[in-house]
Amino acid sequence: MKQSKYKYIAHSENSNGAEQSMKQHSESVAELMRSFALADDFAEIYSYCGLLHDIGKYSKGFQNYIRSREEKEPHAKWGAYIALMNKLVNIAFPVIGHHAGLPNRDAMVETLGLCAKDENRWKNIQQAMEEDYFIISMCDNSSFNKIGNVFQKELFVRL
């Protein structure tokens, strides 16, 4: 597979001097999340949370921050935005809250509404994902509907 000319990174150099690419990070977190699934029916939806959680790190602002410690740019909202655009509200909650904790629904909708207005940044993230050959085929709500009762769904959102 062809490699991107620009290396999008998720994490700066560790103690061994190695950076972690965005694609590698997202795919490894997706696999880790899949392993946390309590049942096979939940594996797909857990995996999508892992894929989406750091998508905002593809933005130019975040890439500048991670390389030079310039102004920090929030990133969690962009994966949640993708989930919401695909009508996966229950995936949006854990994705947007993976650093700051779960927002209430109104706060999340307000934040994601701001994403919708920031067309330039959204296009930048999409373009970066394409350049990095990082494609996400979204699941549908049927994956979430396999989670049996309301208590299991609540546990998923808070996991």
Q: Which positions does each model-derived feature cover?
A:
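Accessory nucleic-acid engagement/destabilization modules that flank
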Residues: 2-159
